[in-house]
A protein has these predicted regions:
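ER/Golgi luminal nucleotide-sugar-dependent glycosyltransferases, focusing on the catalytic module
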Residues: 1-160
């Protein structure tokens, strides 16, 4: 994906002045590209094997779940409560039905238009705006999780 970096930088560099926190637009677009590709691989597998998953989970490999979570199927997209920077919505983990997760995983396609339309950009505010535009309802279950790279055992509830 290193070959994509210069192209992506051309697409989004004019919006770098809008960045909040330590966000990086190239890293953000790369994250959503990888999310899209993972979902495409899942769909390819489903077609090849003749199966359809009822529930799709998107997470990161550096998340430590401190307690088991109950993945309940719903018409809403489940995004763990907390880790909401700048009044955005947590982008660490989400789960839901095929339709909601398909939409979630396709944020990449809207990335440039979203970054052009937003006054301030970080991953969480972009995700929140995208879900609002796509009319995706969310549930916010409490999930006790830690990021391994932070090397701490504290759960953050960055919500008011």
């Amino acid at each position: 994906e290193a070959g994509f970096e210069s192209k992506w930088k051309q697409l989004v560099s004019h919006n770098e002045y809008k960045l909040e926190t330590n966000a990086n637009l190239v890293s953000m677009i790369s994250m959503w590209y990888k999310t899209l590709r993972a979902n495409q691989l899942k769909k390819k597998y489903e077609n090849l094997m003749g199966v359809k998953y009822d529930l799709i989970l998107k997470t990161r490999p550096d998340i430590i779940l401190e307690e088991p979570i109950e993945l309940i199927q719903s018409d809403s997209l489940a995004i763990p409560f907390g880790w909401d920077w700048s009044e955005g919505i947590n982008d660490l983990m989400a789960w839901g039905n095929q339709s909601n997760m398909e939409t979630y995983c396709e944020l990449f396609y809207s990335f440039v238009s979203l970054s052009n339309s937003m006054d301030k950009i970080n991953p969480e505010t972009m995700l929140k705006e995208y879900l609002k535009i796509k009319n995706i309802k969310t549930e916010r279950p409490k999930v006790d999780l830690t990021l391994r790279d932070m090397n701490i055992k504290t759960t953050y509830w960055f919500c008011k």
